[in-house]
UniProtKB/Swiss-Prot annotation:
The lineage of its organism: Eukaryota, Amoebozoa, Evosea, Eumycetozoa, Dictyostelia. GO terms for biological process: cell surface receptor signaling pathway. Residues 31-169 form the FZ domain. It comes from Dictyostelium discoideum. It is found in: Membrane. Disulfide bonds join 36-106, 48-99. The gene is fslL. This is Frizzled and smoothened-like protein L.
Length: 619
């Protein structure tokens, strides 16, 4: 039961609300430069002619011209048509509100005695503005409670705007009702083939088919596609990432080519480990070559097609070829690495037992690598990795089943054998009471650490990117808002840091450099080159003899001369007939100990020169 006291309080509340609403309607100043003029017409993007309440009377002033308003509307229409929801784009209220907010209806008043005229704009009601921003789900992008920048008064009044018209002999407290249009389904909704920069318009009738061709649409009902490279970074930052990929591809390619040439062509005593290394290094070389092919084709930007509208897919020869090469030899390289780990452990564990499984594992590795590489090709699933710079297997399902899971298993098995190798070395050295265990094991430790840790990072980053795809590409609206307010080239979508993607690229392309450091920078490689035809030919001998003659001349007749060659060191004292000392190299042509095991890359030291190798003769 409502008492008289309740009625009294209710009446007071109504009075308070009414008083609040009246006092919230602030008085707007009259701009003396304001005037009414006809609508200048639609642009390519903005179609307001059918949505304005009065196209013959649009408010303009020195601070707000129709051209300025049309530029702003072009941006908002572009955003609306590009990423607006279906219900937002299909409602006439959206366009009526948007057009009338920036092309305000104009009312003019004239003093008949002085013929002075003033013009004032009719603003959109705040409730209408809130309804539209909620309908279009852009409350975070547009605040209906904001103030106008010039007079710092509400852009959208609650009910009406108050003006002082005493200047033209009118009401000093004139109330101009705000504009609140009603949705009208009979009004034709505009259709345009325009997309705001940097989005690109594609005339698509089948989004699913076009997505298979490499396009990525900003929404299911828009023909605007995301540009490539994806604006995760600025163009300058993308260029730095491209340079990193190109440089590492070349370095890895050159490094592995050096190893193949040194240990399989120049090397006069090739052993089983050289042959095994050649299979592994050859696979890494081909992995790196895929990046070099892209470089010579124009760099990673050559994988971007149609002016940045789409990425390369299996139909593009460069993409399918480099993707197939990278997948094929990545699988082969890791399988050869596992076999190398096993054979190294077996030789150290069972020194007297011979093992020859090449006729089994080489065909097996070739078959597995081909199968895992042909499946993506047959299912049309090679494409450029969006937000990256090479082509590879598409879809998470295929990546996991054909690469990540097999690779993880193989890496783990290889790591176990490397661990056993380190254990055996430690056991043997400890049994002989010799120090320097860490020095002996350092290359094995680096081998497992570098390869395994880079794999872990690649694995984690790949899954992170797959999980972030919806988040990254769901920020087109905020990205576009940035382009409205700033230089578009400096606007980016919030995604993985440039450092994390840069390290991902580093891990993919660095394996050839790893191989060169671990295998190519040692005494054995130096000695192979030293004894090769490049340093043992007439031209080099001529240069060496001339240098020695110069050195001999510089010492004078009473001096001491020392001559060093690849095999013999001779020291001669010319006075008093002192004995001369000849030291034959432990690696001379006829040295019986110079066998295959001396060149075993997994031996930790060469045979030492003993006293029996030293001959003392009379000069």
């Amino acid at each position: 039961m409502i008492t008289n006291k309740s009625k009294y309080y209710f009446f007071l509340i109504l009075i308070f609300i009414n008083f609040y609403l009246i006092n919230c309607q602030e008085e707007y100043p009259i701009d003396q430069t304001g005037k009414c003029e006809p609508y200048i017409g639609d642009s390519q993007i903005t179609k307001c002619s059918t949505f304005l309440p009065n196209i013959n009377s649009i408010y303009v002033s020195a601070n707000s011209t129709q051209k300025d308003s049309m530029k702003t509307l072009d941006n908002y229409f572009g955003l609306l048509l590009a990423v607006g929801s279906e219900k937002c784009k299909d409602s006439s209220l959206t366009y009526q509100t948007l057009c009338s907010m920036y092309l305000k209806e104009c009312e003019s008043f004239t003093d008949n005695s002085t013929l002075k005229t003033v013009s004032i704009p009719k603003r959109i009601c705040r409730k209408t503005c809130n309804d539209v921003t909620k309908l279009c789900n852009i409350e975070s992008l547009f605040n209906c409670s904001q103030n106008e920048p010039i007079n710092n008064l509400p852009l959208c009044p609650l009910n009406y705007s108050i003006y002082d018209l005493s200047l033209v002999n009118g009401d000093s407290n004139y109330e101009l009702q705000c504009y609140s249009p009603l949705s009208n389904d009979s009004i034709e909704i505009p259709v345009t083939n325009y997309c705001p920069f940097p989005l690109i318009y594609i005339n698509s009738t089948d989004h699913s088919a076009d997505e298979d061709r490499g396009y990525m649409f900003v929404s299911g009902n828009s023909n605007c596609v995301v540009p490539n490279p994806v604006p995760l970074y600025t163009p300058k930052q993308w260029d730095r990432l491209y340079d990193l990929s190109n440089s590492l591809s070349v370095l890895s390619c050159v490094g592995t080519l050096f190893l193949l040439f040194t240990f399989n062509i120049l090397n006069k005593k090739i052993n089983r480990f050289d042959r095994m290394n050649s299979l592994f290094n050859g696979s890494v070389f081909m992995m790196s070559l895929s990046g070099v092919i892209i470089l010579f084709a124009g760099g990673p930007r050559a994988l971007i097609k149609d002016g940045g509208a789409r990425i390369s897919v299996w139909q593009d020869p460069l993409c399918s070829a480099t993707g197939f090469i990278f997948q094929l030899f990545s699988i082969a390289a890791i399988l050869f690495w596992v076999v190398m780990s096993f054979e190294l452990w077996y030789k150290i564990k069972f020194m007297t037992k011979k093992l020859d499984l090449k006729k089994y594992y080489i065909p097996f590795i070739i078959i597995v690598s081909l199968v895992f590489s042909i499946i993506p090709l047959a299912t049309k699933n090679y494409r450029m990795i969006r937000g990256n710079m090479h082509c590879w297997v598409h879809t998470t399902k295929l990546q996991n089943s054909l690469f990540w899971i097999p690779l993880g298993i193989a890496i783990t098995i290889g790591t176990i054998f490397i661990g056993l190798v380190m254990f055996e070395i430690h056991r043997i050295v400890s049994a002989n009471s010799k120090g320097g265990v860490l020095k002996l094991e350092i290359k094995s430790i680096l081998n497992v650490a570098l390869i395994y840790l880079t794999f872990i990072y690649l694995f984690a980053f790949n899954f992170y990117m797959n999980g972030q795809e919806g988040v990254v590409y769901g920020q087109i609206e905020s990205f576009y808002q940035c382009t409205l307010e700033n230089d578009a080239s400096e606007c980016t979508i919030q995604g993985p840091s440039i450092g994390s993607l840069g390290f991902f690229i580093f891990c993919i392309r660095i394996y050839g450099v790893y191989c060169f450091i671990l295998q190519g920078l040692n005494y054995r490689a130096y000695n192979i080159w030293k004894e090769s035809i490049f340093f043992n030919n007439r031209f080099v001998s001529y240069i060496k003899n001339n240098i020695l003659n110069i050195e001999t001349s510089s010492t004078g007749s009473g001096g001491t001369s020392t001559t060093a060659s690849a095999t013999t060191t001779t020291t001669t004292k010319k006075h008093n007939g002192i004995d001369s000392l000849n030291i034959d190299s432990a690696f001379s042509k006829n040295n019986e100990s110079d066998d295959e095991d001396d060149y075993d890359p997994y031996k930790k030291s060469k045979n030492n020169i003993t006293l029996k190798d030293i001959e003392v003769s009379k000069s």
